[in-house]
Amino acid sequence: MPRRKQQAPRRSAAYVPEEELKAAEIDEEHAEDGGLSLDIQESEFACNEETEIKEAQSYQNSPVSTATNQDAGYGSPFSEGSDQLAHFKSSSSREEKEESQCPDSVSYPQDSLAQIKAVYANLFSESCWSSLALDLKKSNSATSNNDASQKESSTPTPTPPTSTASTACTTATTAITSCSTSTSHSSTTSNSSSSGYDWHQAALAKTLQQTSSYGLLPEPSLFSTVQLYRQNNKLYGSVFTGASKFRCKDCSAAYDTLVELTVHMNETGHYRDDNRDKDSEKTKRWSKPRKRSLMEMEGKEDAQKVLKCMYCGHSFESLQDLSVHMIKTKHYQKVPLKEPVPAITKLVPSTKKRALQDLASPCSPEPTGVATEVALSESAKDQKTANPYVTPNNRYGYQNGASYTWQFEARKAQILKCMECGSSHDTLQQLTAHMMVTGHFLKVTTSASKKGKQLVLDPVVEEKIQSIPLPPTTHTRLPASSIKKQPDSPAGSVASEEKKEPEKEKEKEKAPPAAGDAERKIKEETEDATEKFEPTALYQYLREEDLDDSPKGGVDILKSLENTVSTAISKAQNGAPSWGGYPSIHAAYQLPGTVKPLQSAVQSVQIQPSYASSVKSLSSTEHNALLHSPGSLTPPPHKSNVSAMEELVEKVTGKVSIKKEERPTEKEKSSPVKAISPVAKENKDLPKTEETGSKPQKKGSDSETGKAKKESTLDAHTPNGTEPLKAKVTNGCGHLGIITDHSPEPSFINPLSALQSIMNTHLGKVSKPVSPSLDPLAMLYKISNSMLDKPVYPTTPAKQADAIDRYYYENSDQPIDLTKSKNKPLVSGVADAVSSPLRESALMDISDMVKNLTGRLTPKSSTPSTVSEKSDADGSSFEEALDELSPVHKRKGRQSNWNPQHLLILQAQFASSLRETAEGKYIMSDLGPQERVHISKFTGLSMTTISHWLANVKYQLRRTGGTKFLKNLDTGHPVFFCNDCASQFRTASTYVSHLETHLGFSLKDLSKLPLSQIQEQQSVVSKALTNKTLGPLGSSEEDLGSTFQCKLCNRTFASKHAVKLHLSKTHGKSPEDHLIYVTELEKQ
């Protein structure tokens, strides 16, 4: 049919100028109205084509866009809301249109008018219309009614068979007209019926461009995959055929969204698995060869980024493939939230995917189910407004660049979040740095899959998970909004409670009695806290009375702690570390070494957020304290009486004689010890896990009864900003308070040290302070409970210890270590911890764990920095002495900082490696690996340093023909300079033999020399170095009773100044080398 052929191109209306479309439509309408003799089938065609044109209209005609700037409209909630609303009703208007278009069923204008009014009423009864829209309703409804009636009257009635069809058409269009007029935000309606008709039809195209399958959600979602159709269709090539529409390949029906198309294909069976053959045909629609090649190169990758299954994250090459996948797997039924889900498959093997879901999903609900209800309702709410599951792969589903930025800013806390510990970061660089420092990038998958398997799923929650797979956020602490997503997960249960605002706590109180009583009890104690301040000032920790108040039967505290310790030990010995308290040992030690900066840093982290927002105030505490741990995977034990504690102490330390005041502290220490090690959790039986999961409330109240009293003193002396923080911790959290037990600043110091001391006892190791390389946190742990098993050697003044006291413990009520068997004063312990960080750590096996975790070797721990230690090095071999005594000489770079002996050896080796040619020129040849190894062994220089030195010398010689000790190499008449005595030589062999006289041995003997001989030869140098390092600490520059001797020529001088002048003028030595070549002699 010629008519059909003419109209075919109109499907891609987005490519056709709007004016042409309108003109064509006007002609078509006039032809119809003029009563052309069309048979019924042709009139059907007219209707179908009109609707196709309408549906294919470009999106520029959207009613929203006419009111607002188009780009701005994309991101604006107003446009979202109105679009949503329009598509909320699209199903009904489409059904009406289809009914009225059916040529067999005769529809009457009166009926359609009634339908129009119904559509009005429905559209504007929606609560989400703004007041602006309501105003428009008054003006526009009148206009559109006149408009509609005008159309009715202008409809001619030709011969009977045609009249039915054309009336149907007109009825449909009038319904459309009024509907779109009312929803449009433009009050301009044209007077002439024909142009008005075109405008309305264009506007309706936008109105109907929404999907009815998502009508369940009136609120807009931030990250909506349904926005796919807003992508620029030219960018993705054949992904979108026609005017950015999803079309069925079989019947060419156009749909606005992929889901609609999928549903259609499923219902009609319009799909085949062997649909790849048609992909090649699509490319022919591209007009320019350049574009075609562009599409062939990039189109597929882009398509795969966009064509993702929203449920499982798999990519597809064409829409049809994706639709077939959706139909076969029924995944389109499982995406009710309009949220993109990250491809979990990329992060973990599919076998572990379920474990991850289990892990991140809620489990261990409150016995009364209160938290579950609250959480479910909140999560339902959040699913519409927040989407923490953002991965870089999802950005193609967003609307455009501007709104993506806006959404990213709004959700930055969830997007830039460490999946292991939940800490949020401001920039990607910070997150990357955090992952590298803590080793979390290694642990995300392994720990998740390990720990995920043992969690027990709540059935209600399981249903939720079926449709919303969660990303692998393993036992994390999330910022407030996302924490609601996994409300009852073990860590989550703590966090979600912490996060609740006071009102929510009150709600909980009113909830079912079992939970209510426990919570109320806690709340009362906390409220009393300030009044109790006077009497309880002496008891900042748990007392026997507190323990007696709430003995709740249950887990054997001894057994659980033994499990914890034994499994931690076995893990440490087997080299498969799994630290609960800190995700990696690096994390445990990443703190500034000095006390003062640490204290200010902690305060800024913890106190400031509480001013900023009460909701976020806890995140800092969590990140410092609990967060690295699946803290409450093994909650504090129930059984908490003094006899149990005595047995525990007896078993762990073999001592029973412990002061009464220590017991509460031990109780307090043991709980976090138990809490911080997931290792124990892994080795415990599943039934136990279930049991702990089912009684969080009990534990909460148990641990808090004493804790409330303990914290009462805290509130009094913490800075203002911290008070709300502390109160909230006390009210909401089951066991956070135990870990944050002394004062807000060092709240994250305690747990590891307790476990550390237990391990010391079990491993039979002597506890020594940690080495500087592992440094800061470990030292702080020692500070917080530094009862050491071996005598201490305080070398710093006690003043320093007092300073630390003042920073860390305002009440001077120190926590007591579990292994405390000899009661020593704290101050000496503190002094020891601070002053002698140079000996080996008691937990060297822990430092070994670092190697396993990150593959990085821990740096050398033997670099004495204080004078007192330097004497210890006397008996060691020369290399050690040199390494330790001259950190300055270990600097690579300017040669003046090198040990001159090392330079002589290197220069001699280099000169001996030069080969003389027949013409008398010298050719540089590289030092062999053997020689390098010998030099390295003798000097202690690393192979890298030696290679760099050689490379540098060669570079200088090639570039300028000379270097410090060798000139004119390129001319064939080289001059070798001796660094020590400034003498010059013409041949390499004489130069080498001269250097060997300085060294006292020949280069060939380098590898054979015994250490003792080297020591003798180098003792002068080491002594000089010692003098150099002691210089500033020693006596005044010129002692009256000494003379100075030049080592090179043995002349003596009355003052240092004279020797320096002599060295500079006679030997050409630089000032930095003076001390090395000067020996101080006692005057006789």
UniProtKB/Swiss-Prot annotation:
Residues 269-284, 496-534, 653-671, 681-714 have a biased composition (Basic and acidic residues). Residues 49-108, 140-167, 269-298, 467-534, 653-728, 855-879 are annotated as: Disordered. Keywords: Developmental protein, DNA-binding, Homeobox, Metal-binding, Nucleus, Phosphoprotein, Repeat, Repressor, Transcription, Transcription regulation, Zinc, Zinc-finger. Probable transcriptional regulator involved in developmental processes. May act as a transcriptional repressor (Potential). Disruption phenotype: Normal Mendelian ratio at birth, but none of the mutant animals survive beyond P0. Newborn mutant mice exhibit a strong defect of the soft palate, vertebral malformations in the cervical and thoracic regions of the axial skeleton and malformations in the middle ear components. GO terms for molecular function: DNA binding; zinc ion binding. Residues 891-961 bind DNA. This is Teashirt homolog 1. The lineage of its organism: Eukaryota, Metazoa, Chordata, Craniata, Vertebrata. The gene is Tshz1. Interacts (via homeobox domain) with APBB1 (via PID domain 1). Residues 57-71, 140-152, 859-868 have a biased composition (Polar residues). It is found in: Nucleus. GO terms for cellular component: nucleus. The modification Phosphoserine is found at residue 771. Coiled coil: none annotated. It comes from Mus musculus.
